[in-house]
Amino acid sequence: SEVIRRRRDEFGLDSFNVGLGLKTIGGALGSVLNAPEHGIDYVEKHVLQDYADFDKLEVTDPYKNPKLAPILESAKRLKDRFPDVSMTTSVAGPISTAIAVRPVEKVLKDTRKNPEMLHKLLDLTVECSLRWFEAFYHEFGSVGTNFSDPVTCMDVISKAQFDEYSLPYIKKLIDGTKKIMGSAPGAHICGKTSPIWSDLADAGLFSFSIDNCEDLEVAKKAVGDRMRIAGNVPPVDVMKEGTIDEVIAS
C-alpha cells in the first residue's frame, strides 16, 4: 500500500491492479508453487500429472480457497485505503493457466494425443477465472479487467493449435467477462502474435498489448479500428536499462 500511496502522490497514479499471477489458479487448484526471494516464481509440482486425477479438481471459490481469499482481502484493504483511485483486476489466459495445473510438455502433447481431456482442463481454467471476476464484481462492482496469456503466442503453439485450443476459450473468457462486468477485458500476449490479431479482435477483445518483437504501426493498420493497441516498448533494453530519452522515443 505504501508503494501505491507514493505512486499516487508523486506521479498522479490513477489506477492500480489487484489480480492473479500466471500461476495463481494453478496453486489454488493444488499445484505446489515456489516463489524465491530473488528470481521468478515457478511451479514446483503440478497437481495434474495424470488425467485420472482430473475429477478431483473443483472450480475454485475465491472466498474459501486459501490461495485466493487473501488476495481478495488485500483488494478490500487497498480499496478502503485508496477509495479515490480506480482498481482493476486480472487473470491468466486459458492455456497459460492450464500449464500451471499440468506440465507444459504434457499439455502440448495433449493437443495431439488427448484433446478431449485438454478441452475439459481448459474449460475448467476459464470457469476458475470467471469465478474470480464474479467475486471481484460482488465486492467492488464493475472494474477494468485484463488477462495475460504468454503460452498462446506463435513462438510456443501453432496457428492450428491456437484455433482449436486457445481461441474458443479466450472467446469464452471474453464473453463471460462481458456478462459479469459489462465490458470486455484487455489482454497481453508475449512474443509473436501477428497471425492471431484478427482473431482476437473478432473475439471481442477491448484492448491488446503487443510485445516489442511486433510492429505497432502494422498492428494499428491491421486491427486498430476494432480494438485498442498498446505495448511494443522493450521491457529490459529500454524500460529497465534505457535512458529517459530512450523511453520517450520508444
Regions found by a protein language model. Give the residues of each.
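Segments that shape or occlude catalytic/ligand-binding pockets
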Residues: 1-19, 23
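Active-site loop segments of alpha/beta catalytic cores
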Residues: 1-3, 14, 38-42, 60-250
